[in-house]
From Swiss-Prot:
Biased composition (Basic residues): 428-438
Motif (Q motif): 9-37
EC number: 3.6.4.13
Binding-site residues for ATP, renumbered to this chain: A53, Q54, T55, G56, T57, G58, K59, T60
Function description: DEAD-box RNA helicase involved in RNA degradation. Has RNA-dependent ATPase activity and unwinds double-stranded RNA.
Source organism of the structure: Shewanella baltica (strain OS155 / ATCC BAA-1091)
This protein's name: ATP-dependent RNA helicase RhlB
Domain (Helicase ATP-binding) ranges: 40-219
Length: 438
């Protein structure tokens, strides 16, 4: 993490439980991010907060540290049953819940606290077996949590800490009734530590906070600009016929270390995956139709570097913290202005530089004025030479084909392979793009 992304507040100087401090130190957490530096002193006084912070600012570790510290410093409720968690963390998506759980497990290492995760799309019985053994911190999506509550598999009578992450996204997805259902089955707000985080503290989000929290302190880490200065944006105006060739040419020339390609529809994503896979790239596909186990595996492969490119719908645009994404390609301009910000926000994180390349084709160019109005600036236009686009593109792969597990096929354009080539030794660009350096 870049030092410029951190504050001067050390975790070691905060009044944290020794086991929490030990876990933080072992995982390289020395200085707080701004949202952590502002929120933790408030939370460590057992005061509720409504925090405004974007994904990637360190808010997850902020509420996890507060949750663990609160449970370790607070007596277990008298008469608590094994099926009653002490803390509940609600997330809008499965992917975000999984990411939160991974971070929670790091903090749990030296404690007696058990972490459990539940979400739809996974085996109901497998998750139930974990719950039957008892969990202290329950992380999950609201729908699956409600299923277990209604069946009496878990009870919320002993909840001492509550986290509502990505609250604005909860509204977007229509989960607010579920959230209120769960809040009504917990102890009163003044008997628990309540934390709400949202990219925007709109009136509806603030109303939710004041309805179900105990006079929350508002903590805001809102960027002055909607898009980071660390992200270099550019936009092309390709025809629909040249869109795919332009994308393949740009990827060929940029050879990004880790890239996400966004498209507006599942069908378009599948087509993109087929062309990229056929062109020899290590690429994963993430849409709503991909089975949950496969989605998890693809995200793990992309995070670990086994895949270089992730093709995704906006299911991956919110809530996922994937470090070191160097490039974001908007193959389609999104219909929602906020989705543009969330998409390109996958890169340029934690003080790192990033590239955002967008295509304004005939179908989606009409979305551009609203996007530029929303982000308060024009996106620089880049031109290209149609005759310089790759012409010898291999046949697209079939969608049911398995992803390769080996290294990327760094063949030359004549079709001869170079199996010994390594990722770091990729061939240089075939075509000059002087606009990059202008």
């Amino acid at each position: 993490m870049s030092e410029t992304h951190l504050s001067t507040q050390r975790f070691a100087d905060l009044p944290l439980h020794p086991e929490v401090k030990q876990a933080l130190a072992e995982n390289g957490f020395e200085f707080c991010t701004p949202i952590q530096a502002l929120s933790l002193p408030v939370l460590l006084q057992s005061k509720d907060i409504a925090g405004q912070a974007q994904t990637g600012t360190g808010k997850t570790m902020a509420f996890l540290v507060a949750t663990f510290n609160h449970l370790l410093s607070t007596p277990v409720p008298e008469g608590r049953l094994i099926n009653q968690p002490r803390a509940i963390i609600m997330a809008p998506t499965r992917e975000l819940a999984i990411q939160i759980a991974k971070d929670a497990i790091l903090l749990a290492k030296h404690t007696h606290l058990k972490v459990g995760i539940v979400y739809g799309g996974e085996s109901y019985d497998v998750q139930r077996k974990v719950l039957d053994q008892g969990v202290d911190i329950l992380i999950g999506t609201t729908g699956r949590i409600i299923d277990y509550v209604r069946q009496g598999i878990i009870g919320l009578n002993s909840i001492q800490a509550v986290v509502l992450d990505e609250a604005d996204r909860m509204f977007d997805l229509g989960f607010i009734k579920d959230i209120r259902f769960l809040f009504r089955r917990m102890p009163e707000a003044n008997q628990r530590l309540n934390m709400l985080f949202s990219a925007t503290l709109s009136m509806k989000v603030q109303e939710l906070a004041y309805d179900h929290m105990n006079e929350p302190v508002k903590v805001e880490i809102a960027p002055e600009e909607k898009t980071s200065k660390n992200i270099k944006e550019e936009i092309f105006y390709p025809s629909q016929e040249e869109k795919m060739r332009l994308l393949l040419t740009l990827i060929e020339e940029d050879w990004p270390e880790k890239a996400i390609v966004f498209s507006n529809t599942k069908h378009s994503c599948e087509t993109l995956w087929s062309w990229l896979e056929g062109d020899g790239h290590r690429v994963g596909l993430l849409t709503g139709d991909v089975p949950q186990k496969k989605r998890i595996r693809i995200l793990e492969q992309f995070t670990s570097g086994q895949l270089d490119i992730l093709v995704a719908t906006d299911v991956a645009a919110r809530g996922l913290h994937i470090s070191d994404v160097s490039h974001v390609y908007n193959y389609d301009l999104p219909d929602d202005c906020e989705d543009y910000v969330h998409r390109i926000g996958r890169t340029g994180r934690a003080g790192n530089k990033g590239m955002s390349i967008s295509f304004a084709c005939e179908e989606y160019a009409l979305n551009l004025p609203a996007i530029e109005s929303y982000i308060n600036h024009s996106i620089p236009v880049s031109n290209y030479d149609s005759e310089a686009l790759l012409a010898d593109i291999p046949t697209p792969a079939k969608i049911h084909r398995k992803h390769p597990s080996g290294t990327r096929n760094l063949r030359d354009r004549s079709g001869t392979s170079r199996p010994g080539a390594q990722r770091s030794g990729a061939r240089p660009p075939r075509h000059d793009r002087t606009r990059r350096h202008s």
